[in-house]
Swiss-Prot record:
The modification ADP-ribosylarginine is found at R102. Belongs to the NifH/BchL/ChlL family. GO terms for biological process: nitrogen fixation. The gene is nifH. It is an enzyme of class 1 (oxidoreductase). Its EC number is 1.18.6.1. The key enzymatic reactions in nitrogen fixation are catalyzed by the nitrogenase complex, which has 2 components: the iron protein and the molybdenum-iron protein. This is Nitrogenase iron protein. The reversible ADP-ribosylation of Arg-102 inactivates the nitrogenase reductase and regulates nitrogenase activity. [4Fe-4S] cluster binds at C99, C133. One of its GO terms (molecular function) is metal ion binding. It catalyses: N2 + 8 reduced [2Fe-2S]-[ferredoxin] + 16 ATP + 16 H2O = H2 + 8 oxidized [2Fe-2S]-[ferredoxin] + 2 NH4(+) + 16 ADP + 16 phosphate + 6 H(+). Binds 1 [4Fe-4S] cluster per dimer.
Length: 299
C-alpha cells in the first residue's frame, strides 16, 4: 500500500473551501482512493455534501454528551458517505467560550488512537484559515498534514488570508515535513483573476494547481446536499473537479517551502494588476463621472 498522504485545505471563511474540498475528494474516490475527512472548521460543514445530510455530530459535542472523549467509540464519531468516504467533524466550543482549536487537537488524537487512520490512502483536513492560530495550525504544527492546498480567489481578503496561511506553513516547514502543495482559485469573476492567482502563487514559491470556474450548478448541488460529482457527474463542472483531483493526486512530493510577502508587496501586486487603485486614480475617476453627470444634466 502506498504511503498515507495527509493533505489539508485551508482558506478564508466563505471562500468555498469546504465545497471545493468535498468535490475534489469525491473525484479522488473515483480514482480508487480510500479517504478519511477530518473537518476542522467550527461550522462543521466539511462532510455535509459527502454524507447528504444537514450537519454531522462533532467529536466535541458527542464527547460533552457522553461525559468525555474517552467514553466514545469510533463508530460514534465516524460516518461513511459517498463511495465509502469516512467522515468526521472535530467541532468547536460555544461561541465566546474556549479555543476552537481544542476540538481539532482532541479529535485528531482520538481518531489516531482508535484506528481511523488505518486502511486509507488520504486523510484530508478541512481547516478555517482566516486566522492561523495555534489550534487551527495544529494539523501543520503537529506534522500531521504534509501538503497544504490554499483555496483563494482574486478578492483582497482571500489573497491576504492565503499569504497569512503561507506564513503559518513557513513557520513549521523547517521543524516538520509540511509543504505548500499549491493554490486553488475559486473564481469570483473579479478583474484579471487568473493572472493575479498565478502571480501570487509564483511570489509564494508555489503554483496554481487549478482555476475552478464559477458555475451555478455548484449551488444547485449544494441545495440538495450533494457534490457536483454526485449530482451531475457528466457536467463540465464535475470535469473541472476531476481535473483538480488528478492534479493533486499527481502532486505527491512536489510541495514547496513558501515565501510569504509583506502587506506592502501584496498591495503593490494589486496596484500592478489594476485591482486596487491609488487615491489619485480613484479621485480622477470620480471627477470624470461627476463631469459626465453634469454634462448630461445640462444637455
Amino acid at each position: 500500500m502506498a504511503a498515507l498522504r495527509q493533505i489539508a485545505f485551508y482558506g478564508k471563511g466563505g471562500i468555498g473551501k469546504s465545497t471545493t474540498s468535498q468535490n475534489t475528494l469525491a473525484a479522488l474516490v473515483e480514482l480508487g482512493q480510500k479517504i478519511l475527512i477530518v473537518g476542522c472548521d467550527p461550522k462543521a460543514d466539511s462532510t455535509r455534501l459527502i454524507l447528504n445530510t444537514k450537519m454531522q455530530d462533532t467529536v466535541l459535542s458527542l464527547a460533552a454528551e457522553a461525559g468525555s472523549v474517552e467514553d466514545l467509540e469510533l463508530e460514534d464519531v465516524m460516518k461513511i458517505g459517498y463511495k465509502g468516504i469516512k467522515c468526521t467533524e472535530a467541532g468547536g466550543p460555544e461561541p465566546g467560550v474556549g479555543c476552537a482549536g481544542r476540538g481539532v487537537i482532541t479529535a485528531i488524537n482520538f481518531l489516531e488512537e482508535n484506528g481511523a487512520y488505518e486502511d486509507v490512502d488520504y486523510v484530508s483536513y478541512d481547516v478555517l484559515g482566516d486566522v492561523v492560530c495555534g489550534g487551527f495550525a495544529m494539523p501543520i504544527r503537529e506534522n500531521k498534514a504534509q501538503e497544504i492546498y490554499i483555496v483563494m480567489s482574486g478578492e483582497m481578503m482571500a489573497l491576504y488570508a492565503a499569504n497569512n496561511i503561507a506564513k503559518g506553513i513557513l513557520k513549521y516547514a523547517s521543524s516538520g515535513g509540511v509543504r505548500l502543495g499549491g493554490l486553488i482559485c475559486n473564481e469570483r469573476q473579479t478583474d484579471r483573476e487568473l493572472d493575479l492567482a498565478e502571480a501570487l502563487a509564483a511570489r509564494l514559491n508555489s503554483k496554481l494547481i487549478h482555476f475552478v470556474p464559477r458555475a451555478n450548478i455548484v449551488q444547485h448541488a449544494e441545495l440538495r446536499r450533494q457534490t457536483v460529482i454526485e449530482y451531475a457527474p457528466d457536467s463540465q463542472q464535475a470535469q473541472e473537479y476531476r481535473q483538480l483531483a488528478n492534479k493533486i493526486h499527481a502532486n505527491s512530493g512536489n510541495g514547496t517551502i513558501p515565501t510569504p510577502i509583506t502587506m506592502e508587496e501584496l498591495e503593490g501586486m494589486l496596484l500592478d494588476f489594476g485591482i486596487m487603485k491609488t487615491d489619485e486614480q480613484a479621485l480622477a475617476e470620480l471627477a470624470e463621472k461627476e463631469a459626465a453627470k453634469a454634462a448630461a444634466a445640462t444637455a
